[in-house]
Amino acid sequence: MVKIVIHEERCHGCGNCVIACPVNACNSPNVWGGKGPEDGEDVVIKVVNGTVSVINEDLCEACMTCELACPVDAIEIKT
């Protein structure tokens, strides 16, 4: 089972992780275009009120792309 840990004190809501996530890109045309996902789309993470939030951890494939995309090490994938 995958656990996504968000270090909210570090996150500044840039959205790099949201756009980098391949699951998000496959499930949301907006993410594929470099924008945030819409409400109701099947995504793993998204920026909510200026901080990244886990939306559906079960969709995470533990590829670590989001973790690598974060410039401030605010997201951590634990397997």
UniProtKB/Swiss-Prot annotation:
For whether the record's keyword set contains Metal-binding, the answer is: yes
Q: Which GO terms describe its molecular function?
A: 4 iron, 4 sulfur cluster binding; formylmethanofuran dehydrogenase activity; metal ion binding
Q: Which Pfam families match?
A: Fer4_7
Q: Which GO terms describe its biological process?
A: methanogenesis, from carbon dioxide
Q: Gene3D superfamilies in the record, alphabetically?
A: 3.30.70.20
Which key words are in the record? Answer: 4Fe-4S, Electron transport, Iron, Iron-sulfur, Metal-binding, Methanogenesis, Oxidoreductase, Repeat, Transport
- Free-text activity regulation comment from the record: Not inactivated by cyanide.
Q: What is this protein called?
A: Tungsten-containing formylmethanofuran dehydrogenase 2 subunit G
The species this protein belongs to is Methanopyrus kandleri (strain AV19 / DSM 6324 / JCM 9639 / NBRC 100938)
Q: Which gene encodes it?
A: fwdG
